[in-house]
Amino acid sequence: MKKTLMLLAMVVALVILPFFINHGGEYGGSDGEAESQIQAIAPHYKPWFQPLYEPASGEIESLLFTLQGSLGAAVIFYILGYCKGKQRRDDRA
């Protein structure tokens, strides 16, 4: 019980602390940061690949990113639950 509460407190701290540490800062994505670094290193760089689908707005892009992450998490946790259930079934037999 004590270990669970300690882990829960650590997770809450990891979620809350960035808002206080970088108060008023902008949370940009890694794509924008990578683009600025590439422009600093090689200003004449021309991308060799274009996206298959360009979302109409940033909100739709965020939605698709969130859906992708949620689907990935669902698959991972389904597999973990399946393996855990299989292990319990084998232990009872």
Curated annotation (Swiss-Prot):
Keywords of the record: Cell inner membrane, Cell membrane, Cobalamin biosynthesis, Cobalt, Cobalt transport, Ion transport, Membrane, Transmembrane, Transmembrane helix, Transport
GO MF annotation terms: cobalt ion transmembrane transporter activity
Annotated GO CC locations: plasma membrane
Main location: membrane
Localisation per UniProt entry: Cell inner membrane
Membrane topology label: Multi-pass membrane protein
PANTHER family, per database record: COBALT TRANSPORT PROTEIN CBIN
Record's function text: Part of the energy-coupling factor (ECF) transporter complex CbiMNOQ involved in cobalt import.
Protein name in the entry: Cobalt transport protein CbiN
